[in-house]
Amino acid sequence: MLGDENGEMSTIPGLNQIQFEGFCGFMDRGLTEELYKFPKIEDTEQEIEFQLFVETYQLVEPLIKERDAVYESLTYSSELYVSAGLIWKTSKDMQEQTIFIGNIPLMNSLGTSIVNGIYRIVINQILQSPGIYYRSELDHNGISVYTGTIISDWGGRLELEIDRKARIWARVSRKQKISILVLSSAMGSNLREILENVCYPEIFLSFLTDKEKKKIGSKENAILEFYQQFSCVGGDPVFSESLCKELQKKFFQQRCELGRIGRRNMNQRLNLNIPQNNTFLLPRDILAAADRLIGMKFGMGPLDDMNHLKNKRIRSVADLLQDQFGLALVRLENVVRGTICGAIRHKLIPTPQNLVTSTPLTTTYESFFGLHPLSQVLDRTNPLTQIVHGRKLSYLGPGGLTGRTANFRIRDIHPSHYGRICPIDTSEGINVGLIGSLAIHARIGHWGSLESPFYKIFERSKKAQMLYLSPSRDEYYMVAAGNSLALNQGIQEEQVVPARYRQEFLTIAWEQVHLRSIFPFQYFSIGASLIPFIEHNDANRALMSSNMQRQAVPLSRSEKCIVGTGLERQVALDSGVPAIADHEGKIISTDTDKIILSGNGDALGIPLVMYQRSNKNTCMHQTARVRRGKCIKKGQILADGAATVGGELALGKNVLVAYMPWEGYNFEDAVLISERLVYEDIYTSFHIRKYEIQTHVTSQGPERITNEIPHLEAHLLRNLDKNGIVMLGSWVETGDILVGKLTPQVAKESSYAPEDRLLRAILGIQVSTSKETCLKLPIGGRGRVIDVRWVQKKGGSSYNPETIRVYISQKREIKVGDKVAGRHGNKGIISKILPRQDMPYLQDGRPVDMVFNPLGVPSRMNVGQLFECSLGLAGSLLDRHYRIAPFDERYEQEASRKLVFSELYQASKQTANPWVFEPEYPGKSRIFDGRTGGPFEQPVIIGKPYILKLIHQVDDKIHGRSSGHYALVTQQPLRGRSKQGGQRVGEMEVWALEGFGVAHILQEMLTYKSDHIRARQEVLGTTIIGGTIPKPEDAPESFRLLVRELRSLALELNHFLVSEKNFQINRKEA
């Protein structure tokens, strides 16, 4: 909670609130809006009418719990029932029944949906808001061309242009344009109405030729001219009903449907008063837009900034779910219409329940959550990742931009983003600037705009009122960027403050300020708000840090950060990872898997998460924090989850770090660590991998799960039970059988034994054999089996195969090749693990845990890590934890450095260690070489920063290939670890071998051992038995491929092979 002595209190909103509000909006409004749009359906002879009674719809509570839905791979959904009536018009009888329409996936307490047992989340999308936008561009002659673009609710565009002669055209396609008079006439206006409704009728009359008068003489002529230009049809088309329908479908529906947001924007921009329920583009809109375009041509009125947030709208979870619900109802309408016609044709008596099926709604939502680009699998690497994923904003997706076509201006930061979209947190790579993150206090307004809170300042009162403003409103106010805490120290009226006004950053007097920001974190996302001393870091490094915190692996023993920002508790609580008491009571008993709580005379069991796998293979586990007999209050923490301690986010460890070079082992961001981090399990994490296999019914018979697998060693089957499934608690190694499975197949005639052939010849018995298709543990999967699930979908047909899933837990210590990072973009790879006695040690004898490269600080300009490092050392010595808000220089100059030095001085004084703070080089200390015992030449910065272990681990990346699969066309090795691929020699390796002049080795690498089909088989044999490698006399596949590609370009390449024996030239075809 954020306080202000002059005003009301401001609380940071729930970090999942944007997801909850979207889903509630769909349930409250979107569902009924789409149901009301469902039409009355009649048969062809208009004897029967079917309709829905929307007022009585109901959603049933789910039959299963969230945890069971995940375990059994089901969808956590609610059944939708609506009353429907079937009316016979001849007898005026009505039959009313409650019908089941389908299942709607529900949102759980984390703001996610569970579909087929998988946590999925829907991302909010940023789209261009429907309306009209004016802009100016230079043509090839350097003359300004003014255009007005009307964007529809579907994303279609209609462009109005004005040429040098002040004639106005509407562009209907890339190459074709028509006069605005023809377009207005085709939409139903006559010439008199056009001239009465424009401000510049003389300009319209100036380009009205006799030919134009003929075209707009009647509505039919105008429609024919419009159709001819739009469809590029030659000759003289004839006016007909089908022609009008085609125009309506291909042009007007796509480009002229504004929607309620577009209608509001159109009215505001053109000063119109057309009713909000009229969401279609009218001739009056076209004429008003043309008038404004003429004014733009003569310098009247401002142009529009397409990248301003007031010209964008958020397509929220509610909009996406409502669109899918509407699509499902359209499909349902077609099904009902077809069923009614079929029943009448076969002279059957239909009922409402017989007409409606639940398939359209259920399949529509399943395909949406499974295939839509904005529906993503929830990233559950750690609690922070879960929260941040639901607050993403994407320009990508249907109706949006693509990473290839988006220009730099769209990706760049805009002044209207402040307080709404984080200027730091975005993706790296091709999607930079296209995927952003919502600022902490921002929310989605009623019209799809992003709103940010401000304090309104009154002249004669010290009270401040908080209000939320959309991007179009805060432009008219002077918004002070600083916080009032700095102003309270002196006389406010005499102070000058930085402010933002109309997309410019100014410095103005305090009495001119209208609004001020409510909190320094207001401009940042959650990831950026967790970086202490962020104001001392370069923005690029802050971006990397906010991304890398989401990649941190939960450790086996988590630890709170000494230096934080104060947001760690809310992130942990809103993530839903810790177990929280719903009401007060007394703890009866605690166990590893549940806590029993008594309250109001009832005993309530609270289940805990036990070794649950996330989709990034990290371990989600809860540990009880309360003891038996303790009285607790509502909202108190009962159990910590993965990466939380005491209800606070704990992603890493506070370790002793020195910034110094050490024998080149921290060259280029490499990190040297002590073996203490390995042996004391400081950075040990648990990972859970899932392996699954399915059993199908083949044409030869069903596949069998069994422990009797022929032709396999008993050692590989040692962990299987009598059913052929691995036993719980077994330790499995690479190559072990997890599930034994036999697939039936018919053997070839030649493979039958003589007695089998006799049986076939005499009795006609088909002897079947089985092929071993067991689930084997792949390379790098060794570990302990912690769970086995046998999942069988309802129905039991061959289309619903049985699935067996085996979960294996791995304990991973930190090792050479793992990636670690701080919270300031300082990342590195472990290069060497040194014995603790060889590590540099402090003056009190303690060896450091990590050695970082000091050259990683000045060029990267992330000095915040040095402040955190020194303050962490002071906090560990004083046993204190610090929570520091950013931009503390608003209190006084050098506030961060003064705080760090004062705490170091106090720690030095309290612990009687003068080396902690030495005035000659504050923050630095002389340390000693563990190998020699002598001091290093220069004093070194030492401290305790918060270091994270990231998901990029060497066990998942390291890969080697001795033999494997080849591509069929090129005969080159496949690419990637998952395909057991790997090109042995690349271009740069060839250069290196060329530099050494090793021609024979190079020839072997590029031909015999690579893509010569016959030679590579012989090479393998000679390598095993010993001997010389045979040299083939024909070309390798890569050369043959080159010849074929040249041949496809009509270039014939004749090649000759020179024999080494008699130097004869033998011509061979490729």
UniProtKB/Swiss-Prot annotation:
It is found in: Plastid, Chloroplast. GO terms for biological process: DNA-templated transcription. Pfam families: RNA_pol_Rpb2_2 (PF04561), RNA_pol_Rpb2_3 (PF04565), RNA_pol_Rpb2_6 (PF00562), RNA_pol_Rpb2_7 (PF04560). Its EC number is 2.7.7.6. InterPro entries: DNA-dir_RNA_pol_bsu_ext_1_sf, DNA-dir_RNA_pol_su2, DNA-dir_RNAP_su2_dom, DNA-dir_RNAP_su2_hyb_sf, RNA_pol_bsu_bac, RNA_pol_bsu_CS, RNA_pol_Rpb2_2, RNA_pol_Rpb2_2_sf. It is an enzyme of class 2 (transferase). One of its GO terms (molecular function) is DNA-directed RNA polymerase activity. It catalyses: RNA(n) + a ribonucleoside 5'-triphosphate = RNA(n+1) + diphosphate. GO terms for cellular component: chloroplast; DNA-directed RNA polymerase complex; mitochondrion. It comes from the Eukaryota. SUPFAM superfamilies: beta and beta-prime subunits of DNA dependent RNA-polymerase. Belongs to the RNA polymerase beta chain family. In plastids the minimal PEP RNA polymerase catalytic core is composed of four subunits: alpha, beta, beta', and beta''. When a (nuclear-encoded) sigma factor is associated with the core the holoenzyme is formed, which can initiate transcription. This is DNA-directed RNA polymerase subunit beta. It comes from Gossypium hirsutum (Upland cotton). The lineage of its organism: Eukaryota, Viridiplantae, Streptophyta, Embryophyta, Tracheophyta.
